[in-house]
Amino acid sequence: MSELRKIEGALISVFDKDNLEPIVRELNRLGVTIYSTGGTQAFIEELGISVVPVEDLTSYPSILGGRVKTLHPKVFGGILGRRELQSDIAQLEQYEIPALDLVIVDLYPFEKTVASGASHADIIEKIDIGGISLIRAAAKNHKDVVIVPSKEQYPTLLSLLKDKQGNTDLEDRKALAKAAFNVSSHYDTAIFNYFNNDEEPVLKQSIQSSKVLRYGENPHQKGIFYGKLEDMFEQVQGKELSYNNLLDVDAAVSLIAEFKDTTFAILKHNNACGVATRPTVLEAWKVALAGDPVSAFGGVLITNAKIDAVSAEEISKLFFEVVIAPAYEPAALEILKAKKNRIILIQKPVTLSKKTVRTALNGVLEQDKDSVMETASDLTPVTDRKPTEQEIADLLFAAKICKHTKSNTIVFAKDNTLISSGTGQTSRVDALRQAVVKANEFGFSLQGASMASDAFFPFPDCVELAKNAGITAVIQPGGSIKDQESIDYCNKNGVAMVMTGIRHFKH
């Protein structure tokens, strides 16, 4: 233990008073002189504990509607004064500035105010000035001062007060200083991002919540998730989500968001291997599973409707890692919980991020999330035969899945059902061949089915192979210098083709 310091004077200035009482009572027990302002001062006085108003220390009242309370040399001098420097001690004595050994702050809730949809004027008033200054000053002088920058550090402080009787060593203070600069940098980043509003190409992120995962993509890799999963899901049971689980859950949530009617999807390694839209969850599940029961084994399941007990009985026949739904019947939960390792998630209503960020080389790539999804009005027929209403429905269904599948990708669909797909291939024609093979493997007829491609056809061989397999309608973005060759082939063979002008690469 090194450079032991005893807390004798404390400044407390917090926005949220929750959980403050035990700390104040412990400080009072130890005989610490407490200084405070405004609402915090009133809170402490209501506890029957003596407190010195900061105004008595500075001889200045709170001014400008509370904008200036603690910004004064008699406050910051007591925080920044170096206890081992005789000249600092002399000045503190000369100007009658008491040493402040502990500073407790809880900042104005800037991020919550922004998220609430408050007016610009209200948001500006929630930019903390005095609090952030106190945090930085106390953290800078952590050699002598204990800084508690948020409620997250209250348990640590209580432990120091009870177990060490208000004494702290340098290691204690340094750890709290690190937390303080984390709080202050996060706060300033949030303010910058509010003002920037994506106007300038500047990437600043600060995510305070993190969770160490069992491992990364493979057991020899370390994995960490930064964010608050509890804002998106309630985990009913199961082991902790792994790195790969999280990637699959992310893909599943993004895919299911495309569908309004009752839909069930099964994913494996970020790609859909079964998707169906039907009147009920049970029907959608059965049809989705039939699409590729082999790949579905050990997959991630998601639906946008409540899972009932009958559906749960059928779902439970499959080994799966994760199931996600907005709600479950109580009986359905009991059925699904029979296998203890199953991860059962209740998805909460939440707005998904509008950006995607990933590392590349020695930097970071950021882009807008691919939030565009074509509707019937976006389709441009380019062939003599126009698609039927059912074909249009199947084309749009296939396009939704195609958008969320690794490139190069081809998707076959019919009657609101994913029949098969070819994914992650280095050539488009190979993706098409893969999709044909998988459809045949599971006994699906492609006669009258529709096909979606995430990008244009560089040659007419794709539409030729598709027609020979039974495909009657095609959706693709177009843009190839050989588009006309594909169109000509479709015209000669009665295939309907529509173009969207929108590519959906996914890497």
Describe the predicted segments one by one.
Residues 1-57:
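N-terminal glycine-/serine-/threonine-rich phosphate-binding loop
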Residues 39-109:
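Glycine-rich nucleotide/cofactor/substrate-binding loop typically near the N-terminus or early
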Residues 83-132, 136-138, 380, 384-389:
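Active-site/ligand-binding-proximal alpha/beta "capping" segment
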Residues 152-160, 164-335, 339-369, 391-398, ...:
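Active-site loops and adjacent core secondary-structure elements that bind or stabilize anionic groups
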Residues 273-293, 417-463:
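Glycine- and Gly-Pro-enriched alpha-helical subdomains that act as flexible
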Residues 301-302, 308-317, 442-483:
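Cysteine/selenocysteine-centered motifs that mediate thiol-based redox chemistry or coordinate metal-sulfur cofactors
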Residues 320-342, 464-505:
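C-terminal binding/interaction regions
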